[in-house]
């Protein structure tokens, strides 16, 4: 394993029984406080995003925004934000999904999101953790409603035991930096 990946793995803190009994939580916030490490992560993700010729970066709140905003700046691609229900004004589309820790959540996007993103069609979904893939599936639905196409998925971490990768669109490439 490359030294940078070892440092990245060491920076991520583990908390047992959080937020629920029996859950192992991976805290990625130390990565953000280390500029060199955060830049390493962004560089890995940006190279992938450029290689797949994405036209826009789509990310969910909250931690997805951290990666998405930095990557939009680094790649010079438009950023499309996906919000939790009742956080956006205007005409919206929505999709429901289930999370690892709770059932039934809703994500929303503006109906003009892709138009404002230079009429982007080829979208990469970026988030911090791939767990059950519920969030990603909801974003896939939203993009389809807007005639967008998911051309890639990009995550810092995959939680393999939750089998989220198997639920991603089968013909869409993905970049995952760490697998736990």
UniProtKB/Swiss-Prot annotation:
Record localization: Cytoplasm
Superkingdom of this protein's organism: Bacteria
Enzyme's top EC category: transferase
Reactions listed under catalytic activity: AMP + diphosphate = 5-phospho-alpha-D-ribose 1-diphosphate + adenine
E.C. number(s) listed in UniProt: 2.4.2.7
Pfam families per record: Pribosyltran
Cellular compartments per GO CC: cytoplasm
GO BP field: adenine salvage; AMP salvage; purine ribonucleoside salvage
Major site of localization recorded for this protein: cytoplasm
Pathway(s) the chain acts in: Purine metabolism; AMP biosynthesis via salvage pathway; AMP from adenine: step 1/1
GO molecular function per UniProt: adenine binding; adenine phosphoribosyltransferase activity; AMP binding
Record key words, sorted: Cytoplasm, Glycosyltransferase, Purine salvage, Transferase
S-S bonds: none
Function: Catalyzes a salvage reaction resulting in the formation of AMP, that is energically less costly than de novo synthesis.
Similarity comment: family membership: Belongs to the purine/pyrimidine phosphoribosyltransferase family.
Record note on quaternary structure: Homodimer.
Name this polypeptide is given: Adenine phosphoribosyltransferase
Organism: Mycoplasma genitalium (strain ATCC 33530 / DSM 19775 / NCTC 10195 / G37)
């Amino acid at each position: 394993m490359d030294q940078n990946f070892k440092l990245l793995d060491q920076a991520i803190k583990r908390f047992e029984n959080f937020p629920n009994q029996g859950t192992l939580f991976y805290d990625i916030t130390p990565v953000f406080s280390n500029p060199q490490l955060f830049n390493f992560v962004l560089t890995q993700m940006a190279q992938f995003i450029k290689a797949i010729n994405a036209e826009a970066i789509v990310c969910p709140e909250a931690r997805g925004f951290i990666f998405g905003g930095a990557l939009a700046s680094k790649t010079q691609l438009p950023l499309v934000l996906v919000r939790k229900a009742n956080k956006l004004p205007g005409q919206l589309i929505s999709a429901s999904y289930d999370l690892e820790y709770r059932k039934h959540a809703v994500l929303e996007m503006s109906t003009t999101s892709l138009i404002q993103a230079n009429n982007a069609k080829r979208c990469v979904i970026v988030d911090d953790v791939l767990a059950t893939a519920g969030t990603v599936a909801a974003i896939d639905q939203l993009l389809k409603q807007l005639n967008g196409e998911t051309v890639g998925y990009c995550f810092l971490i995959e939680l393999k035991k939750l089998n989220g990768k198997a639920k991603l669109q089968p013909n869409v490439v993905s970049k995952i930096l760490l697998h736990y």
